[in-house]
């Protein structure tokens, strides 16, 4: 597995909170995420939104037959294409440069993503109609609103759906 800190160093970037970039670097979390898909999930084509420097992408390639990454940052999309050249040439990985809220998303059998915090609800609502298994990482406050019980301050549109 590729080391997430080494990927960030090779990419020559830092997460930029103002651009909603938060890179996941905890190997324990990265290693577990693909395993949260249901045991019977079809992993023939997994979609990742916000590939960043590829820490999760690398893990998904070990768990899925094919992965498509949507990355809106041109620098990071170019880095992913360079870092994962072999996987792209083997037709196991596609990198789409674009905003997941604006582009036409490819068909997929499951999605595992560390979503950009500022648009996590919009992306989640975009993925849900596909009816496919989703493993989505959210900011804690967002997750609390999503799981809120009726009558609590956090209860709202996210809780109802």
What are these regions (language model features)?
Residues 1-161:
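Catalytic cores of RNA-modifying enzymes
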């Amino acid at each position: 597995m590729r080391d997430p800190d080494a990927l960030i160093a090779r990419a020559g970037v830092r997460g930029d909170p103002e651009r909603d970039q938060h890179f996941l670097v905890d190997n324990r979390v990265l290693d577990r995420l693909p395993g949260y898909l249901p045991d019977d999930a079809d992993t023939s084509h997994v979609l990742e939104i916000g590939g960043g420097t590829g820490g999760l992408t690398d893990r998904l390639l070990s768990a899925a037959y094919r992965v498509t990454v949507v990355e809106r940052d041109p620098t990071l999309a170019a880095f992913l294409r360079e870092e994962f050249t072999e996987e792209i040439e083997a037709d196991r990985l596609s990198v789409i440069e674009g905003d997941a809220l604006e582009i036409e998303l490819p068909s997929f059998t499951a999605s595992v993503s560390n979503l950009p915090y500022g648009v996590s609800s919009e992306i989640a609502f975009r993925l849900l109609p596909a009816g496919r298994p989703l493993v989505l990482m959210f900011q804690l406050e967002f997750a609390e609103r999503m799981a809120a019980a009726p009558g609590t301050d956090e209860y709202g549109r996210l809780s109802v759906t």
